[in-house]
């Protein structure tokens, strides 16, 4: 028997049941021959002291026979599913080094197994009564908090990942063991920290206590022996090694794992393989997140930690790695642990960055709104220009660029049913006028289209497929658009028939037909409320032909019809009245030489229609009236007014040709008014006051 390392005794590697004396006659250790610290032995050696340690085998009957209250021997559970042939001295030296790590912490020896002189708190980790694997059979009433479920395992906890250690979850811990453990855990007592770590992290109630890194009690941990305190995997690492490989912790090169804040290990305790690590199931390890510090317990942080945990756990559950690989993975896991924290805080900084730039985003939103408004105006003008050359049935909301299609529609059953529905709400004569009006309007649109085609026939049409190559896999096809279902269907007979006979289409088309009928009545009334069409209707009811009269420009009539689909706003009505008043005033000034209403001056002699010929055909010619107003916001309102009442402005195009002649008169008229009233109010005042002084010229 060789001398112990540092006074603790050495471990003999003899082929037989050798004993290593602990200190000077303290107790003999057994069962570590041939690196077989699981080997069951049947020899009890007693030294000079009264502390004798006999073995307790896996068979509970033997352990029960030799265990009793006040017995001379305190049994130690020795476990050995298979012998190991590695008999090297390096293993013994490593074991002694780990014993020395414990001696540096406490420096005190001696403990009482039978109740004599518990002088050392630290030694309580090493010398206590050890239960057999089945704690119920050998110690029926040993501890009131002993777990109530069995450990049915045959030396290999692989079928159940928890092995014999599932009792650690939520069990009561022994205060005697916990009292002297905090300082050892804070100092890094070898690789035994993994035991306390798994206990604390598996039980959330123990995390924020004053002793957060206590190892579990003997009752909740039937395999807690002095050996588990020396290896990194903890007491649960001895549950039953896999026959395929030795325990990795015995060959670990790192004597103390890395520590983070408050003594928490940065190295990955969860990275160990299951039978040697903590024995916890992978699902339980994922269910509870890691806690790297007291300031990282938020739900978001937990979610990130759990994801990080899965990355490093799953390979260990599937692959049997070498010991050196296990060590490197522990360090790597710790590095990844802190890297994940940095990424977490970086993500939080990025999350709060938008809050710091809200002012800039508000400005960007304003710019985006302005751009969108401009785009809407351009789209409106483009649509208006397209409507001038597009065939349309206003009451049915049918539009087409093909003459044949509009003719078919006017003779279709749908169009006739729509007019029949309108005739139930409006007089028959009015409905007939609507039909005649729609037909005549489309004739005028056809003439306009022919003129435009002659002018623009030389211009090549843009190809929408220009720049689209075969790599985009585009193909030009014909398709049908189902307005009721809002769906595009390729123009193939099978697909079209399938859609036409589908239940959804038949349901949607009935709803659409009802909706179109209701809308058609509203549109018809709006069209008939237009002042130009009202005059035409009066002539039609008198028996005259309103469509042959050239009093209204055909182009304007078409625009009026399009505008009739929506009711006129008060601004549009005011603009129309103002245009009429100005026209009457101009005629009075030019024809009779009378002063313009409200003291307006005569126009300059040099000013005439030629000078403003270009402005005559402008769609915003109404701005000529309002541009001289002293109010700074008047021109902008004039723009909006001109857009809102653009159709009416075009309707009064002939009358407004003479507006340019009386710029001075209009200027005087507006300047004589009250300063800076709203544009509509100014128009209303002029509407009320001016007709009194106007001499009718008709």
Curated annotation (Swiss-Prot):
Residues 1-198 are annotated as: Interaction with MCM2. SUPFAM superfamilies: Porins (SSF56935). Residues 325-335, 552-570 have a biased composition (Acidic residues). Residues 108-204 are annotated as: Interaction with DDX5. Residues 108-117 have a biased composition (Gly residues). It is found in: Nucleus matrix; Nucleus, Nucleolus; Cytoplasm. This is A-kinase anchor protein 8. Binds to dimeric RII-alpha regulatory subunit of PKA during mitosis. Interacts (via C-terminus) with FIGN. Interacts with CCND3. Interacts with NCAPD2, CCND1, MCM2, RPS6KA1, PDE4A, CASP3, DDX5, CCNE1. Interacts with NFKB1; detetcted in the cytoplasm. Interacts with MYCBP; MYCBP is translocated to the nucleus and the interaction prevents the association of the PKA catalytic subunit leading to suppression of PKA activity. Interacts with DPY30; mediating AKAP8 association with at least the MLL4/WBP7 HMT complex. Interacts with HDAC3; increased during mitosis. One of its GO terms (molecular function) is protein kinase A regulatory subunit binding. The gene is AKAP8.
């Amino acid at each position: 028997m060789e001398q112990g390392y540092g006074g603790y005794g050495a471990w003999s590697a003899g082929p037989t049941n050798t004993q290593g004396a602990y200190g000077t006659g303290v107790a003999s250790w057994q069962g570590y021959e041939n690196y077989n610290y699981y080997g069951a032995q049947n020899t009890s050696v007693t030294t000079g002291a009264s502390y004798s340690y006999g073995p307790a085998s896996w068979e509970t009957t033997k352990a029960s026979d030799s265990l009793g209250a006040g017995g001379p021997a305190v049994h130690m559970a020795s476990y050995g599913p298979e012998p190991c042939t590695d008999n090297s001295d390096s293993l013994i030296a490593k074991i002694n080094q780990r014993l020395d790590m414990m001696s540096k912490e406490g420096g005190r020896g001696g403990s009482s197994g039978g109740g004599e002189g518990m002088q050392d708190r630290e030694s309580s980790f090493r010398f206590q009564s050890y239960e057999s694997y089945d704690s119920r059979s050998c110690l029926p009433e040993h501890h009131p908090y002993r777990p109530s479920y069995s450990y049915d395992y045959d030396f290999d906890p692989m079928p159940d990942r928890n092995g014999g250690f599932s009792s650690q979850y939520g069990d009561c811990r022994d205060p005697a063991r916990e009292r002297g453990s905090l300082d050892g855990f804070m100092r890094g007592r070898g690789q035994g920290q993994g035991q306390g770590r798994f206990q604390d992290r598996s039980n959330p109630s123990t995390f924020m206590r004053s002793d957060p890194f206590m190892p579990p009690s003997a009752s909740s941990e039937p395999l807690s022996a002095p050996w588990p305190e020396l290896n990194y995997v903890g007491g649960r690492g001895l549950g039953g090694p896999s026959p395929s490989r030795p325990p990795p912790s015995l060959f670990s090169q790192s004597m103390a794992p890395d520590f983070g804040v408050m003594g928490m290990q940065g190295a990955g305790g969860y990275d160990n393989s299951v039978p040697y690590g903590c024995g916890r199931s992978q699902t339980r390890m994922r269910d509870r997140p890691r806690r790297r510090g007291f300031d990282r317990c938020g739900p978001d942080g937990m979610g990130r930690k759990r994801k990080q945990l899965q990355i490093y756990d799953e390979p260990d559950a599937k692959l049997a790695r070498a010991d050196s690989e296990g060590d490197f993975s522990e360090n790597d896991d710790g590095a990844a642990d802190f890297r994940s924290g940095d990424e977490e805080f970086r993500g939080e900084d990025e999350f709060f960055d938008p809050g710091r730039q809200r002012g800039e985003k508000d400005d960007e939103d304003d710019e985006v709104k302005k751009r969108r408004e401009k785009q809407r105006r351009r789209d409106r003008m483009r649509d208006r220009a397209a409507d001038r050359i597009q065939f349309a049935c206003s009451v049915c909301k049918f539009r087409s660029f093909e003459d044949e299609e509009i003719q078919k529609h006017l003779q279709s059953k749908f169009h006739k049913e729509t007019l029949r529905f309108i005739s139930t709400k409006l007089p028959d004569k009015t409905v007939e006028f609507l039909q005649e009006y729609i037909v005549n309007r489309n004739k005028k649109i056809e003439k306009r289209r022919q003129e435009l085609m002659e002018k623009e026939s030389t211009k090549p049409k843009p190809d929408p497929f220009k720049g689209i190559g075969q790599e985009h896999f585009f193909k030009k096809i014909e398709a049908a658009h189902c307005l009721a279902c809002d769906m595009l269907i390729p123009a193939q007979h099978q697909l079209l028939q399938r859609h036409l006979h589908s239940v959804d289409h038949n349901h949607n088309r009935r709803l659409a037909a009802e909706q179109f009928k209701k809308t058609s009545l509203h549109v018809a009334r709006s069209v008939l409320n237009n002042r130009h069409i009202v005059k035409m209707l009066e002539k039609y009811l008198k028996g005259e032909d309103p469509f042959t009269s050239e009093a209204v420009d055909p182009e304007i009539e078409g625009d009026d019809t399009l505008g009739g689909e929506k009711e006129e706003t008060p601004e549009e009505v005011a603009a129309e009245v103002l245009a009429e008043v100005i026209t009457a005033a101009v005629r009075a000034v030019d024809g009779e030489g009378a002063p313009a209403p409200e003291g307006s001056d005569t126009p300059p002699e040099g000013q005439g229609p030629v000078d403003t010929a270009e402005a005559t055909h402008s769609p915003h010619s109404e701005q000529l009236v309002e541009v001289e107003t002293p109010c700074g916001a008047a021109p902008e309102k004039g723009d909006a007014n001109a857009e809102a009442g653009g159709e009416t402005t075009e309707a009064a195009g002939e009358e407004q040709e003479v507006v340019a002649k009386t710029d001075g008169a209009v200027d005087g008229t507006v300047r004589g008014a009250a300063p800076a009233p709203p544009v509509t109010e100014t128009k209303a005042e002029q509407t009320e006051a001016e007709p009194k002084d106007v001499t009718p010229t008709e």
